[in-house]
């Protein structure tokens, strides 16, 4: 695995390709005291070595399957390596706060939206990275860590070097947990009905 520090990746903090992480030095220099930004960026881009690289999904049509799942699992990795406080800080900085700002502003929007059909009032980044991750964390809360990780393992094995659809990931969570999760899945990914209480 190589890390390459680059001067400009537009507005992205990092980009991942197979075996290489590009870290945007220019963007990170804007907040040199914020090491957690660098830390979470690296956890997120490492996550793309699985979600998006080894296990594919149509990220143009179902961006949350790659970005939301990567954010959710990056939090798990960060908690394991740096402790739960670091992961909680990243959760709020990268997912909860942007999503609450959306809810308080233009209101909720559907997370499973094509990059070509995204609403102007709801940035895809907030939906895919924020609401998407929160949806996967809601599933984890519903089914527990063991079933959640078992589902991800099964999903990764089934779609290694393949392209999965949303129903494939939902099926993996349902099979691992023995629960019907369609309603919970729909609330977070297919509908625009969540509230700050969710």
Regions found by a protein language model. Give the residues of each.
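The feature captures the short pre-catalytic strand/loop hairpin that immediately precedes
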Residues: 105-125
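Glycine-rich, acidic and aromatic/proline-enriched surface loops and short helix-turn segments
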Residues: 10-15, 100-102, 141
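Post-HExxH zinc-binding segment in Zn-dependent metallohydrolases
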Residues: 20-29, 62-107, 179, 183
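Amphipathic alpha-helical substructures
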Residues: 85-87, 123-198
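Juxtacatalytic substrate-recognition/specificity segment
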Residues: 1-49, 53-62, 73, 122
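Secondary-structure transition/capping motifs at alpha-helix termini
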Residues: 1, 29-33, 57, 79-84, ...
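Alpha-helical scaffold elements that line and support the substrate/ligand-binding pocket
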Residues: 46-56, 70-74, 131-149
């Amino acid at each position: 695995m190589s890390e390459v520090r680059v001067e400009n990746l537009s507005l992205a903090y990092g980009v991942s390709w197979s075996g290489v992480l590009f870290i945007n030095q220019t963007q990170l220099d804007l907040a040199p005291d914020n090491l957690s930004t660098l830390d979470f960026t690296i956890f997120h881009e490492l996550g793309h070595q699985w979600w998006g690289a080894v296990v594919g999904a149509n990220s143009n049509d179902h961006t949350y399957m790659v970005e939301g799942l990567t954010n959710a699992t990056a939090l798990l990795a960060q908690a394991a390596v740096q402790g739960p406080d670091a992961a909680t800080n990243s959760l709020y900085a990268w997912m909860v706060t942007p999503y609450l700002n959306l809810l308080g502003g233009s209101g909720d929007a559907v997370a499973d939206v094509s990059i070509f059909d995204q609403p102007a009032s709801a940035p895809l980044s907030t939906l895919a990275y924020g609401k998407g991750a929160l949806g996967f964390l809601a599933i984890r809360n519903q089914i527990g860590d063991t079933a959640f990780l078992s589902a991800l393992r099964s999903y990764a094995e089934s779609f290694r070097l393949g392209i999965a659809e949303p129903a494939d990931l939902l099926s993996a969570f349902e099979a691992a947990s023995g629960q019907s999760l369609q309603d919970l899945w729909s609330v977070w990914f297919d509908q625009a009905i969540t509230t700050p209480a969710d």
